Amino acid sequence: MGRKFFVGGNWKCNGTTDQVEKIVKTLNEGQVPPSDVVEVVVSPPYVFLPVVKSQLRQEFHVAAQNCWVKKGGAFTGEVSAEMLVNLGVPWVILGHSERRALLGESNEFVGDKVAYALSQGLKVIACVGETLEQREAGSTMDVVAAQTKAIAEKIKDWSNVVVAYEPVWAIGTGKVATPAQAQEVHASLRDWLKTNASPEVAESTRIIYGGSVTAANCKELAAQPDVDGFLVGGASLKPEFIDIINAATVKSA
């Protein structure tokens, strides 16, 4: 059984009620491959999760953009995994580079978050990736392996984890890793999983690419053997997200 193509849309801190309803309408009307070819998950801000979930076409799912590292309680401003489960939200994005950089989330903290979210029944899009300085220093795989190791040390079952490789230098900058650069890191990550988790985990875990994915570059990226989908930022707020979802047909062709 091959790895089903996965396309996530991270709306980040964007949107009004009107804008969200327009995006959902576009998604609902878009012509996309069937759900046995591609899995689609969109991640609106917390406040819009219920409305998006209730209005979105049935075969698409929603993800939260974060959740707290343990059970809820006296943690003002946080949202717990239990609350997301209670709302019927199946997915959560954890370890996004913006949270690592702006909010100081460490590899260990992200590992704890992933483990707790999984323990409560959520599926996780776990983000890893290097900065431009780290890439230029030749330490891309060291950085990505350390981030992945912090997760691997806390979990045994990878069946509900999608790994998103997002080179920080390519997020929202218009710069994009070349298909060859993306493939190189994805293949190295899969090798790391083979050695440090198991060959089965390496074979079955989807590794998706994020970082200035557009309708123009998605098909070439999707053609890479170890690129199993995308985590899309800015383009997920636009009609071109439908084109990106359709890149899944490259794999099934």
Curated annotation (Swiss-Prot):
The EC number(s) this enzyme carries: 5.3.1.1
Xref: SUPFAM superfamilies: Triosephosphate isomerase (TIM) (SSF51351)
Catalytic activity of the protein: D-glyceraldehyde 3-phosphate = dihydroxyacetone phosphate
GO molecular function, one term: triose-phosphate isomerase activity
The keyword Cytoplasm belongs to this UniProt entry's keyword annotation: yes
Active site residues of this protein: H96, E166
Record keywords, A-Z: Cytoplasm, Gluconeogenesis, Glycolysis, Isomerase
A Pfam family this chain is assigned to: TIM
Compartments it resides in: Cytoplasm
Any one biological process term the GO annotation gives: glycerol catabolic process
Statement: the UniProt record of this protein carries the keyword Cytoplasm: yes
Cellular component GO terms held in the UniProt record: cytosol
This protein's pathway: Carbohydrate biosynthesis; gluconeogenesis; Carbohydrate degradation; glycolysis; D-glyceraldehyde 3-phosphate from glycerone phosphate: step 1/1
Alphabetized InterPro entries for the sequence: Aldolase_TIM, TIM_sf, TrioseP_Isoase_bac/euk, Triosephosphate_isomerase, Triosephosphate_isomerase_AS
Binding positions (substrate): N10, K12
Protein family membership: Belongs to the triosephosphate isomerase family.
Subunit field text: Homodimer.
Note: In plants, there are two types of TPIS, cytosolic and plastid.
PANTHER family: TRIOSEPHOSPHATE ISOMERASE, TRIOSEPHOSPHATE ISOMERASE, CYTOSOLIC
Name the UniProt record assigns to this protein: Triosephosphate isomerase, cytosolic
Species of origin: Zea mays
